[in-house]
């Protein structure tokens, strides 16, 4: 692809994403499906703006590569060892059972047995990019089902190696393509990568970090990820597996969070590009000519994988309320099918339109997953949020809660426990099914679902409640929920969690004056203890803490970004210069004795 064509393609990708994803979010179908539909629109079977799909699809796999690196950073080797049973037990069972059933059905559909085996293995794989994205959106990452889902996906990535090696054997060309010496060299190179990464990566990043130049650290991170991907690709292995291993090797290093921050922006953009590329690859011509075959294939594929996954989740001991989510999030075909089927086609295992039919089936199955997850969410919401059959209800089951708490993470738990301890009637909204089940055991009134849905808020008693406490992890969800409450439930007293000054400014601009910055109060308390440790009288340190809180809050309100950036920067610099002077002057002039009951936020 020429430079000008690449630039044009980049502009088209960005335009498609900007146009389609917000529309998909407004329709409630999720960002992933929005990307897929955008790809169909600009691809060769849509408006035809881009025709070189294969090259773009290969490039867009970098999104999956970056995603797997970040996942590796979150899993240290000891944690990976703890998951061995689910990886090699449930993961292997899912691939083998699904592949066997699907291969048998393909043989009934007049596929050669060799092609059916390859087709069954390819269809048994799930989309790592889509599944992980949806698990993050649905809050499944910390749940049992999310951990099991990740284990299955990891085994599927490991299964890439033997699956690709199996293709020439099935094609009858093993003598020409299977070289034991080359295999041994690949294993040796892989071992060198593991050992070298284990002992060299930390010293290298320590040397780079010592330079103090953030851009160089980001460049080094990109170099590591891309080098690991290219190295594994040269060995004929999965690029995503290589970067995952690199992430695991750095998971226990002191640079883990900095590495994650450096990669995260690239990961999100390239993942979007990957989904757009998958949408572009959908062959609508094959779909039109074999509509019934493709439709039946998609339904059968999703049903078989869901049934297999559901049964395995049951055997593994996953809660019944989480099994459907686990089964549906992995029910689609995956990106690995494109690689495996292309390799099989080069070995002439497929006849006629068989490869095209399989790829269309995989692509459409990926489009069904967001819709399937949305439907299951509604079903779970009706099931979990329905009226209790218990006649004996604890006092927290009052139909008219005083407070609605959105989110039951570490921040929300403290608030909910404090309110419960003071006999306040509360209702909790949470989208982690495991947390919902646990909270109900302890007498909390909990509603499962997305709190940004008006109907869920109504069901939770928003029309009768006095206050709502928003403790969402994502700032976007917080601001969306604030706007929703102001529009539909203007009587609610809104209190919110702010992750930092930027979100605090956004809340102030939205009219929310009661908020708490999650690290501010704890930092002030530690600062007070530091002053005491340096010899300051405890009472004086307490007064200093309260004065600083008031001054900081005043500056926060005065620096709401209503003017240009230069004006705001100028005011911030001026405020910093005057902070010490103001602090000392007001400490001296303060006549009122402040104590711990004064409220400044």
Curated annotation (Swiss-Prot):
Highest taxon, organism lineage: Bacteria
PROSITE patterns: RCK_N
Ranges of residues in domain RCK N-terminal: 400-519
Keywords: Antiport, Cell inner membrane, Cell membrane, Ion transport, Membrane, Potassium, Potassium transport, Transmembrane, Transmembrane helix, Transport
GO cellular component, one term: plasma membrane
Keyword hit for Membrane: yes
Location of the protein in the cell: Cell inner membrane
Gene Ontology molecular functions: glutathione-regulated potassium exporter activity
Membrane topology: Multi-pass membrane protein
GO biological process, one term: proton transmembrane transport
Transmembrane regions listed in the UniProt entry: 4-24, 29-49, 55-75, 87-107, 111-131, 152-172, 177-197, 207-227, 230-250, 262-282, 284-304, 324-344, 356-376
Family assignment from sequence similarity: Belongs to the monovalent cation:proton antiporter 2 (CPA2) transporter (TC 2.A.37) family. KefB subfamily.
Record NCBIfam families: 2a37, PRK03659.1
PANTHER family: K(+) EFFLUX ANTIPORTER 3, CHLOROPLASTIC (PTHR46157:SF4)
Subunit structure as annotated in this protein's UniProt entry: Interacts with the regulatory subunit KefG.
Function: Pore-forming subunit of a potassium efflux system that confers protection against electrophiles. Catalyzes K(+)/H(+) antiport.
Descriptive protein name: Glutathione-regulated potassium-efflux system protein KefB
Biological source species: Salmonella schwarzengrund (strain CVM19633)
